[in-house]
Amino acid sequence: GREYAGQVEVADIGFPVQALEAVKAAEGTAAGDFAVTYGDEDLKRIPRRPAYSNKGTFGKVLIVAGSRNMCGAAYLSALSAYRTGAGLVKLLTVEENRQILQERLPEAIIAAYTPDQLMEGREEFRKMIEAQMEWADVVVLGPGLGNGPYVEYLVEDILTSAFVPVIIDADGLNAIAGHPYLTSYYTENIIVTPHLGEMARLTGEGIEQIKENLAGTALEYAG
């Protein structure tokens, strides 16, 4: 414990000199084109938060996340949105998650649905999704959605209503990998954030193959 830790120093994590040298050496290549380093001057690009403001001033985030056995993904996504400055956060999740999320994060807005509601009332559900999308300035889609049969339709309804930026992660990407026709709904508003395993499922390429050409694979997938 702390008694045996000795003197603790907090060091700047920084970037290894070797890493920065590798970035410089890669200039002119696909990897170099996407390698960016930031300095103190770049902090000035972050907009100042006005003092004369309210929670509606700082954006509305709709998070479509969580399933019966994975409410933590929804909770952590919403908490992260608040901690990075979002003014209003709404969670669209399954009904089973309502109570625990209201207890753990009472400041969040909860909009709940049931898988049966989605599967049996497609048109009504689609109208509900459209209304939620009109409310939002940005959407997060995927964390902890699971792989139930209804997830395909949920992802489709979000993508067809994507008039604001939509960040797709985790099970949202898995649904797209399992149902490739969903990529036909991609627009300039869609941002995907796959890890290596998810990228392998999306592209059909092996993980080792992707590792050898990370930037190139991303560029090719982006079209």
Where are these regions (language model features)?
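Small-residue (G/A/S/T)-rich helix-start motifs and N-terminal tracts that mark the onset
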Residues: R2-I167, N174-V192, L196-G223
